Amino acid sequence: MELLLLSNSTLPGKAWLEHALPLIANQLNGRRSAVFIPFAGVTQTWDEYTDKTAEVLAPLGVNVTGIHRVADPLAAIEKAEIIIVGGGNTFQLLKESRERGLLAPVADRVKRGALYIGWSAGANLACPTIRTTNDMPIVDPNGFDALDLFPLQINPHFTNALPEGHKGETREQRIRELLVVAPELTVIGLPEGNWIQVSNGQAVLGGPNTTWVFKAGEEAVALEAGHRF
């Protein structure tokens, strides 16, 4: 499988997806036809989200079609060489994808050679479940099971920092709560600016920041760029 799972879409001082464009270009391998799944968008319309994505990827020669615009979404997925899933609200993304019957077709198409690109919520959707999203559950997705393309759970935008005086839980504490009730899971705390690239059966960590791996009953383990999962 070919996956590019990004923690986030924007870095300080850079344009939207700018840091990801070299990674995307390197993994295209001649692919040009893409479908974009914009359902995580809440405060922007799906048309706006699709148009923005198409504009950014056009210089790479990628032709982007919004899945919500086509008459036959399943046929569009089958024909697509690239499947792109944008960030936003993970619960809405999963709900819309499930209700439209897209989960199994997307997973199948990626397993048969389509490149999957997802950032933030799109990275969450590639995991076995969305249980490590940071998002508010604004809708009920009728279950948390997702695409299961990547075998570990990703927590995007990972940071353990708290504002001064803040008394809420740290991100690690939230993850530890999950591991109490689901000790079989492994969670990757993927900070902004980092990514996981899967190609030729190898999953490799990239990015400038330390990534953390959490398992039940174990201390967190720090990983740096180049680590192979």
UniProtKB/Swiss-Prot annotation:
EC code: 3.4.13.21
Pfam hit, one: Peptidase_S51
GO function term, MF aspect, one: serine-type peptidase activity
Location of this chain's protein in the cell: Cytoplasm
Active-site residue list: S120, D135, H157
InterPro entries: Class_I_gatase-like (IPR029062), Peptidase_S51 (IPR005320), Peptidase_S51_dipeptidase-E (IPR023172)
RNA-binding is among the record's keywords: no
Keywords tagged on the record: Cytoplasm, Dipeptidase, Hydrolase, Protease, Serine protease
Top-level taxon: Bacteria
Gene3D superfamilies from the UniProt entry: 3.40.50.880
Catalytic activity: Dipeptidase E catalyzes the hydrolysis of dipeptides Asp-|-Xaa. It does not act on peptides with N-terminal Glu, Asn or Gln, nor does it cleave isoaspartyl peptides
GO biological process: proteolysis
Gene Ontology CC terms: cytoplasm
PANTHER family per record: ALPHA-ASPARTYL DIPEPTIDASE (PTHR20842:SF0), PROTEASE S51 ALPHA-ASPARTYL DIPEPTIDASE (PTHR20842)
Protein's job: Hydrolyzes dipeptides containing N-terminal aspartate residues. May play a role in allowing the cell to use peptide aspartate to spare carbon otherwise required for the synthesis of the aspartate family of amino acids.
HAMAP family assigned: Peptidase_E
Protein family (similarity comment): Belongs to the peptidase S51 family.
Name used for this protein in its record: Peptidase E
Organism for this UniProt entry: Salmonella paratyphi B (strain ATCC BAA-1250 / SPB7)
